[in-house]
From Swiss-Prot:
A cellular component term, taken from the record's GO annotations: apical plasma membrane
Gene designation: rhcgl2
Coiled-coil ranges (or none): none
Topology within the bilayer: Multi-pass membrane protein
Family stated for the protein in its record: Belongs to the ammonium transporter (TC 2.A.49) family. Rh subfamily.
Single GO MF annotation: ammonium channel activity
Organism per entry: Danio rerio (Zebrafish)
Regions of this protein lying in the Extracellular compartment: 43-73, 120-139, 184-191, 254-264, 320, 378-409
Protein name as it appears in the record: Ammonium transporter Rh type C-like 2
Length: 488
C-alpha cells in the first residue's frame, strides 16, 4: 500500500511546464536519428530513380506518363492538405488554443511521417539490396499513418505537452504499422479509406490515452474549454478542406481504374447525404431549432469515415447515400448525448469529440465493409470483378465473398484491440511526471507553450466594427458578451 501511495504522490506532484530542454532535445535527437536511419535503410524506388530510363526500356514503357507519380500525385496533394490544413484548422475551435491546434498538428505530422516511412517500409517487401524503396504511394501511406495520430490528438487537445505528443506519435506510428500489416497483409482485409486501420485505431488509441490521463479537476479550466465566434469560423475552414478532399483520401491508394473511380463516387455521395441529416438532427434536438456549430464542423464528415472500408466495393450510389444518412444521425446524437455520458460515467474527456466523428463511424465502416464483402456476387461484380476485389495479394487465390466478410470482421477486432490496448499502455507512459504537461487550471491555453500576442479578444474585429451600424444598439452588449469575451 505504501508503494501505491508513493507512486500516486509522484504522479500528483506540482506540474513543471518548462520544456526548454526536453523539447529541443527530443526534436534534435529524433531528427539526427532519422538522418542516420534514412541514410542506412532508405532509397528511391525504381520510378523515382535515375535508372527509370532503363526500367522503361526493360518493361517496354513508351512514356513517362506511365510513371506512378502522375497517377498518384493529385491524390497525394489533396491528402497532404487534409493532414496539415484540414486536421489542423478543424481543431482551432478552442478560444485560446489555436496556436497549439495548428502548430502542434504541424509538428507531430512532420515528426510522424518520417518514422512512418521507416516503419511501413520495414513491414513491406524490401528491394534486392535490402533497402526500403520509397515512391509517391509510400508518401500517401505515411500521411495515412500520421492521420491516425492526429485523430488521437483530438482526444487530448489542450491537455498535454508537445513532448507528450511526440512520444504519443512515436508509439502510435509503431502500433499503426504493426496493425496495418496484420489487417492488410496477414488477414488480407480490404480497407481503402481506412475506416478500420486509420479511424477506428486512431480514435480508440486517443480515447484510451485520454482515459488513463483523466483529470478530475479539469473544470478549473472549463472557461477556456469552449469557442468564440471567430475560432469556430477558423475550425469551419478545416471542415471544408476535409469535406472537399475526402474523396481523394478514400480513393488515393485504390487500384487505377474502376476501383479508384468508384471509391471517389461513393465517398462524394456519402458526404453529401451526411450534411443534410446532420443539419436536421442538430436543429431537431435544439429547443429553439438553432444549429450547433460543433455538429456542423464535425458530424458532416462522418459519412466519409464510414464509407472508407467499402469505398471500392459495389456499394451502389444509393447505398452510399444510406451510409451517409445514418452516420449523420448517429454522429450528431453522439455529440448531444454520448460525449457527456463518456465524461461523466466512463471518465473519458474527449476534447474534440473524436468518438463521434472517427470511432463510431469507423466501426460502422468496418461493419458495412464486412456486410458488403459477404454479400458480393458474380451477378453484381462479374468473375473478373470478384477476382480483382477479393484476390489475395501475391497469389492467384480468390476468397469466397462470405469468407472475405469474416476476415473483414476480424480486421475490425484487430483495430479495436490495438487502439484500446496500445492507448492504455501509452497512456501509462505519458502519465509519468516528466513530460511537462500543464496543470488543470492551465489546460486549453496557448500561453503555457507559446509566445502569445497581447490579448485582443475585447477588440471587435475591423469588419464587424465597420458594419456595427447595422446592429441595433441593444444588441452591442450581447454581441460582445457572447462572441468576444471569455465565458466564466
Amino acid at each position: 500500500m505504501g508503494n501505491c501511495f508513493g507512486s500516486r504522490g509522484i504522479c500528483d506532484r506540482p506540474k513543471n511546464t518548462n520544456i526548454r530542454l526536453s523539447l529541443p532535445a527530443v526534436c534534435f535527437v529524433w531528427q539526427v536519428s532519422m538522418i542516420i536511419l534514412f541514410g542506412v535503410f532508405v532509397r528511391y524506388n525504381e520510378e523515382a530513380d535515375t535508372n527509370w530510363v532503363y526500367t522503361k526500356k526493360e518493361k517496354n514503357i513508351t512514356s513517362d506518363i506511365e510513371n506512378d507519380f502522375y497517377f498518384r500525385y493529385p491524390s497525394f496533394q489533396d491528402v497532404h492538405v487534409m493532414i496539415f490544413v484540414g486536421f489542423g484548422f478543424l481543431m482551432t475551435f478552442l478560444k485560446r488554443y489555436s496556436f497549439g491546434a495548428v502548430g502542434f498538428n504541424f509538428l507531430i505530422a512532420a515528426f510522424g511521417l518520417q518514422w512512418a516511412l521507416l516503419m511501413q517500409g520495414w513491414f513491406s517487401p524490401l528491394g534486392d539490396d535490402g533497402k526500403i524503396k520509397i515512391g509517391i504511394e509510400n508518401l500517401i501511406n505515411a500521411d495515412f499513418c500520421v492521420a491516425s495520430c492526429l485523430i488521437a490528438y483530438g482526444a487530448v487537445l489542450g491537455k498535454v505537452s508537445p513532448v507528450q505528443l511526440l512520444v504519443m506519435t512515436l508509439f502510435g506510428i509503431t502500433l499503426y504499422a504493426v496493425e496495418e500489416f496484420i489487417i492488410l497483409r496477414v488477414l488480407n482485409a480490404k480497407d481503402a479509406g481506412g475506416s478500420m486501420v486509420i479511424h477506428t485505431f486512431g480514435a480508440y488509441y486517443g480515447l484510451s490515452i485520454s482515459r488513463v490521463l483523466y483529470r478530475p479537476n479539469l473544470n478549473k479550466s472549463k472557461h477556456m474549454n469552449g469557442s468564440v465566434y471567430h475560432s469556430d469560423v477558423f475550425a469551419m475552414i478545416g471542415t471544408l478542406f476535409l469535406w472537399m478532399f475526402w474523396p481523394s483520401f478514400n480513393s488515393a491508394i485504390c487500384n487505377h481504374g474502376d476501383g479508384q473511380h468508384r471509391a471517389a463516387i461513393n465517398t462524394y455521395l456519402a458526404l453529401a447525404s451526411t450534411v443534410l441529416t446532420t443539419v436536421a438532427i442538430s436543429s431537431m434536438f435544439e429547443k429553439t431549432g438553432k444549429l450547433d456549430m460543433v455538429h456542423i464542423q464535425n458530424s458532416t464528415l462522418a459519412g466519409g469515415v464510414a464509407v472508407g472500408t467499402a469505398a471500392e466495393f459495389m456499394l451502389m450510389p444509393y447505398g452510399s447515400l444510406i451510409v451517409g444518412f445514418f452516420c449523420g444521425i448517429i454522429s450528431t446524437l453522439g455529440y448531444i448525448y454520448l460525449t457527456p455520458f463518456l465524461e461523466e460515467r466512463l471518465k473519458i474527456q474527449d476534447t474534440c469529440g473524436i468518438h463521434n466523428l472517427h470511432a463510431m463511424p469507423g466501426v460502422i465502416g468496418g461493419i458495412v465493409g464486412a456486410i458488403s464483402a459477404a454479400a458480393a456476387s458474380k451477378e453484381v461484380y462479374g468473375d473478373l470483378g470478384l477476382k480483382n476485389i477479393f484476390s489475395i495479394e501475391g497469389s492467384n487465390v480468390t476468397r469466397l465473398p462470405t469468407v472475405q466478410g469474416g476476415y473483414q470482421a476480424a480486421a475490425l477486432c484487430v483495430a479495436l484491440c490495438f487502439g484500446i490496448g496500445g492507448g492504455t499502455f501509452v497512456g501509462l507512459v505519458l502519465k509519468l511526471p516528466i513530460w511537462g504537461d500543464p496543470a488543470d487550471e492551465h489546460c486549453f491555453n496557448d500561453e503555457m507553450y507559446w509566445e502569445v500576442p497581447e490579448d485582443e479578444e475585447s477588440i471587435i474585429p475591423p469588419v464587424l466594427s465597420y458594419n456595427n451600424h447595422m446592429i441595433p444598439n441593444n444588441k452591442h452588449e450581447e454581441m460582445r458578451e457572447t462572441n468576444f469575451a471569455e465565458q466564466s
